[in-house]
From Swiss-Prot:
Domain of life: Bacteria
Pathway of action: One-carbon metabolism; methylamine degradation
Organism: Methylobacillus flagellatus (strain ATCC 51484 / DSM 6875 / VKM B-1610 / KT)
ATP-binding listed as a keyword: no
UniProt KW Manganese keyword: no
Entry keywords, A to Z: Cell membrane, Membrane, Transmembrane, Transmembrane helix
Spans through the membrane: 37-57, 58-78, 116-136, 143-163, 187-207, 210-230, 263-283
GO cellular component: plasma membrane
Membrane topology category: Multi-pass membrane protein
Entry protein name: Methylamine utilization protein MauF
Subcellular location per the Swiss-Prot or TrEMBL entry: Cell membrane
Length: 283
């Protein structure tokens, strides 16, 4: 039997069983080096201009706090383009056909998922805050800002492919077999905690390192918990899309289509926020 005939038989067999997702033939592609370099320069320019505008509108501390909150929330959202982000959106869904009843039955899963993220923020943020209180409580605020800003610039260039930065990550995934052993609400809690700890699974955004650094060097336990909590809010909220009548394949295809653009947004944010922070320190 020819290969084409075998493939035809397999396809017809699949159709008789479960519905198959069609193969993708077009994928998100990285831009040319020239375009990426232009985006880098525009990010730095936007950051410098934005820093100067913020300096004239408010105090440096308020401006830096606002910039960091935006960066942390956006970083949490951009982590959706990690393998664990794809998985949580796919696995933590209402069972059966979409209806008000199915969404109502699924709601506890979302809320336990959010609770898991909150627990992760308390554990990770508490540990970082305690370590910072012991080691860095006397570190001048300007030193921390300068260090984190330079680190953000480095990782911004890394995201655009012009610099190689260290990327220590545990290349692990949420345990998919858990869905066969626990009820949906328990799975939501376990996944939320694993993802909320941020270093138990692979996270595809270096904004995590900036968030971790700020939580560590702030030297205060409560502040560190809030910092990790802000990042985790950005991570958790995308799962709320499953409250809507959107098919799983639609969500997954949309994520795949914007994969490279998410990396560019990541780099743009790091470069612009890092540049703005340095401008605020200089002025």
């Amino acid at each position: 039997m020819s290969i084409d005939a075998k493939l035809s038989r397999q396809a017809s067999g699949s159709k008789a069983g479960v519905a198959c997702v069609p193969d993708a033939y077009s994928f998100s592609e990285a831009r040319s080096p020239g375009t990426r370099f232009a985006l880098m320069l525009s990010a730095v320019a936007a950051g410098l201009a934005g820093g100067a505008m913020l300096h004239s509108a408010m105090s440096a501390t308020s401006a830096l706090t606002g910039l960091f909150i935006v960066l942390a929330l956006a970083g949490g959202f951009l982590s959706t383009w990690s393998p664990c982000g794809y998985s949580s959106l796919s696995l933590l869904r209402p069972a059966g056909r979409y209806s008000f009843a199915s969404v109502l039955r699924w709601s506890p899963t979302f809320f336990t998922h959010a609770l898991g993220y909150a627990i992760g923020a308390v554990v990770l943020g508490g540990a970082l805050g305690m370590a910072g209180w012991l080691l860095f409580s006397s570190l001048p605020f300007s030193y921390m800002v300068a260090g984190m800003a330079v680190l953000a610039l480095g990782y911004g260039a890394h995201q655009f492919g012009f610099m190689k930065m260290p990327y220590p990550q545990r290349r692990a995934q949420v345990p998919h077999d858990a869905r066969f052993r626990f009820r949906s609400s328990v799975i939501g809690l376990l996944y939320g905690y694993a993802l909320g700890m941020n270093y138990l699974t692979y996270v595809q955004t270096p904004i995590l390192y900036i968030v971790t650094g700020v939580a560590l060097f702030c030297g205060d336990v409560k502040t560190a918990i809030v910092i990790i909590g802000i990042f985790n809010i950005g991570r958790c909220l995308p799962v709320a899309v499953n409250f809507l009548p959107v098919k799983n394949v639609t969500v997954q295809v949309w994520l795949a289509r914007w994969q490279e653009r998410a990396v560019e947004v990541d780099g743009f944010l790091l470069l612009s926020v890092g540049s703005a922070a340095l401008m605020l320190l200089v002025l």
